[in-house]
């Protein structure tokens, strides 16, 4: 997804790209990814939803907004969902979300199924929880943030650092 640093509700760094420049450069990267992955299911995030949240706070109806596919410059093969549940190879359900709680295994307990989530830059793990009927797991996939980027400079005030990661099922 795109970071949308320049659209953030937080103060933007004047030495970083404007929203338009950031969008154009992001579209190029997403187009490259689309060539590799022409069909993808993605979950909405606090970054991807930025254009909608900024429009809402400024009184702009969603009908005046272009779709996220158009904004990102990708085709209809990419589909975004608020959250997504699918069946795994063993027939069990898997719940995917951008981020609901930092405690992923607790989310697996609450959902009653295995879960995958991101958002929490400093969390990368797989944890298990079980009961007499089922063994579920939670996968926290870290992030793909560039810790040296000026857009992530706010992190320098925290002791924890992002963990680069990716999950594969």
For each predicted feature, which ranges?
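Conserved beta-strand termini and adjacent loop/short-helix elements that scaffold enzyme active sites
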Residues: 43-45, 81-83, 97-99, 141
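Core catalytic region of metal-dependent phosphoesterases/phosphodiesterases
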Residues: 1-74
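Conserved beta-sheet core of the metallophosphoesterase superfamily
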Residues: 91-168
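Active-site-proximal loop/helix segment associated with metal-binding centers of metalloenzymes
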Residues: 58-86, 120, 136-148
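Short, conserved active-site loop motifs that form the nucleotide-linked donor/cofactor pocket
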Residues: 40, 77-79, 94
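Short, basic, glycine/proline-bearing loop/turn elements
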Residues: 11-17, 86-93
